A protein has these predicted regions:
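Glycine/proline-enriched, intrinsically flexible loops and inter-domain linkers
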Residues: 1-310
């Protein structure tokens, strides 16, 4: 789809804390720098502060795009022998275990366990966007998926399971930006601006012309197989094999029933009644107190850092 708008919902801790100020500055700058360079306007958003987020801020982002309903490309792998391409940025160690961290139980010590941060390149993303939109006009693409959380292992398993097929992948053919990467690091890397593309066999030159036009790295790293299984090699050495469905929610992936208890503060909140709040003697003081709250005060200082028109 052609992105036409970005939105965000940001949750930070106590604004008086230096750590929160650092979080706010970094997040707002990151959204502004990437979004403005990518060329998609930020049309709506919100910022909220609460001590609950002192250790771990919550950053929600959303993109809205337009695509013709008959040109939607699914994240699916099928067609035995069809080549599997990796396209876009080279692969590094950035973001490894990012998905693990996002799903972990967070404590006050969690900041010590932060994964390495993904290295974003909005200009590469722009090239990848234009190339995929051009690919969308051809009949050569069987399926396509971006590589976000858990990288190659996630994209290959989800596409294979959805298409009821498998893949043979040679990790030795994945373009790398760092030396001496272990196979598991290549599999789990969350380097941004990468796509996994399954192309109909015989159309390789057609899609490669498009990738080359947009000056994108592209490499055939494997092929689709009949068996519902993923095989990962480094050159000719098998380093991992697993059924695709075992890694996909709704397939064979384990589902955990976590223990939980009802927070005590919920019962305290239920006791609140507006009738118990005394009427103020000075409404002006109340208004001034309210508008001084960081959750009510103007967020103009944030909004003005984002492009709202492109």
């Amino acid at each position: 789809a052609r992105p036409v708008a970005q939105l965000n919902s940001l949750r930070f801790g106590d604004p008086k804390l230096d750590r929160t100020k650092w979080h706010v500055k970094g997040v707002v700058k990151g959204i502004g720098d990437y979004g403005n360079s990518f060329g998609v306007p930020v049309l709506a958003g919100e910022v909220f502060f609460d001590k609950t987020y002192n250790t771990n801020p919550l950053i929600n982002a959303m993109s809205v795009g337009l695509v013709k309903k008959d040109r939607i490309i699914s994240a699916v792998a099928k067609g035995v022998g069809n080549p599997v391409y990796i396209v876009g940025s080279s692969t590094g160690k950035d973001g490894i275990h990012g998905a693990t961290f996002a799903s972990a139980n967070l404590t006050e010590n969690s900041s010590e366990d932060l994964p390495s941060v993904q290295v974003g390149d909005p200009f590469m993303e722009k090239l990848l966007l234009e190339a995929t939109l051009e690919l969308n006009k051809s009949a050569a693409v069987i399926g396509m998926q971006d590589m976000g959380a858990a990288g190659i292992i996630c994209s290959t398993s989800e596409m294979s399971e959805k298409g009821e097929h498998g893949m043979k992948i040679d990790l030795g053919k994945v373009p790398l930006r760092q030396k001496n990467m272990d196979p598991f690091e290549i599999l789990l890397s969350e380097s941004q601006e990468r796509m996994l593309v399954v192309v109909e066999k015989g159309h390789e030159k057609e899609v490669e012309r498009i990738f080359d036009k947009w000056d994108l790295n592209r490499e055939i790293i494997g092929e689709v197989i009949e068996e519902d299984k993923l095989y990962f090699y480094v050159d000719d050495e098998l380093v991992a094999d697993v059924p695709a469905s075992s890694l996909v929610l709704g397939g064979g992936a384990p589902v955990y029933d976590r223990e939980y208890t009802k927070p005590a503060y919920i019962d305290e909140y239920k006791k609140f009644s507006i009738d118990d709040v005394p009427e103020p003697s000075n409404y002006l003081e109340v208004v001034m107190e309210l508008i001084n709250s960081p959750n009510i005060a103007s967020k103009r200082w944030v909004v003005e850092q984002y492009d709202t028109m492109v």
